[in-house]
Amino acid sequence: MKGVVFTEFLEMVEQRFSPDMVDDVIDDARLPHGGVYTAVGTYPHGEIVAMVVALSQRAGLPVPDLIRAFGEHLFGRFVQAYPAFFTGVKDAFGFLSGIEDIIHAEVRKLYPDAELPRFIVEYHDADRLVLLYQSPRHFEDLAEGLMHGCVAHYKEPIRITRDTT
């Protein structure tokens, strides 16, 4: 998993909780990399899972809720860090339906070793978008949080539902 995910997670923990909480989470998680990440590095998915579990235990909040909140935070950071991805995109459906062919294609150019999830458009019309999420990491809560962040960014009254079948 790319280091930007790790650095942004730690940034969110610092903003929403405290710098001390970041230190506690890193200590509790007993991470092989010691909590030191670079945005362009690649790290095991298990390390971020360990940090989320440690945060959940410290904060008393459910892991899925924390991961979804992180997804929302991460989308906002992507808007700031990668404005070109949003240029000319008029709405949430336009952005979400272009993740695989536009966003991930560009990410692969920058980071050929990136292990990205897949977002397959199963159905799309003016009122409904059905996306299929595929990833061996099963970070569905993160994907859902990113979608909520997208909807909030475009300020649209879109309801997100999840089918786990």
Show the residue positions of the predicted features.
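Charged, compositionally biased N-terminal leader segments and the immediate start
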Residues: 1-34
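Long amphipathic alpha-helical segments
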Residues: 21-58
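Amphipathic interaction/junction segments at domain boundaries or subunit interfaces
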Residues: 47-140
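Short secondary-structure junctions
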Residues: 110-115, 152-158
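Short, non-transmembrane amphipathic alpha-helical segments
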Residues: 141-156
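Beta-rich nucleic-acid/ligand-interaction surfaces
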Residues: 160-165
